[in-house]
């Protein structure tokens, strides 16, 4: 086994994969606003090359940060000198990546049908796109594949449409993987797609939903970034677009929407993980969805799925003001997380983005809500930080199954409360 790990590191070096040997993920606990500001100072020190998995928000909210090996001592000294407590969540990031790669390699095979497809492992972009074609071929009267655009690097952007007939019927939109490193989301999206085809005509409650509402599912919302997480840098979050005047690549596609764009909660620095881009909708991956939603004109629920933190959130992210539908969205969130917890006891918190996690401007669901899509939600799936973005493949199916129960709750509510 040790030999395999050494081999994987060597192969990574040969094929140009970025390695994370000795990188640690620290969980920082801030006691007051002064400590929050100190951590923000740390965040601004670019030479440390810190990667905030959960950024500084408010006292009592945990902060998770990946620290490269050369920066570990400096970061720990900084925290200790300011009386800020921390613990090591992940001792060596590369060891988790090696385990992930070994698992993928061990279970890699070309599926001949969606029944033989392995839902309990992580897949490449090509494997997921092959899965889309299999699903459509097996369910031609229920599923179709729509290309809504091309990425910055020229890859097709696909959405699955599940429909029992008609055009521009009231619809539900679900997307996964807008942040490319959140692999459990794309994997869950694949499972959702199969689940829809299995349950239609078999499960009465779900059949009632699809008899009236269409479902659009975008499994790989950031294809360039996702391909890059497999080829080069597993920790890549953003798109892969180039910014004039900067050597840094990519825009945070969840800060690029035209809702509070460029306000606090996003960065104007192209090297930041939360860089908002030159202007709203600058990213074709975002603009493709914007154009689709506007052209469709009848989307009633919009659900964007991220990881991690175990949260279900509704607008707003860029301001503290409650949305007009606050009470209904809060009650629906409560019902959805209760349904989710009924399977394995997984606890999700819920609330508006700005209160549940942190201020985020230019986010997906703030824009969709501004377009009149009342049931606009964002999930943060498993876990709460033990593995973070590197959730073991053994948790894919349990994550997807419990999330499906929450999605069903939202979809049923959308069906029963037309507007």
Curated annotation (Swiss-Prot):
Main location: secreted
Active-site residues, Swiss-Prot/TrEMBL: 380
CDD domains per UniProt: M14_CPA
Gene Ontology cellular component list: extracellular space
SMART domains: Zn_pept (SM00631)
Keyword entries, A-Z: Carboxypeptidase, Disulfide bond, Hydrolase, Metal-binding, Metalloprotease, Protease, Secreted, Signal, Zinc, Zymogen
Textual note on the cofactor: Binds 1 zinc ion per subunit.
Keyword Zinc: yes
GO terms, molecular function: metallocarboxypeptidase activity; zinc ion binding
Protein name per UniProt: Carboxypeptidase A1
Lineage: Eukaryota, Metazoa, Chordata, Craniata, Vertebrata
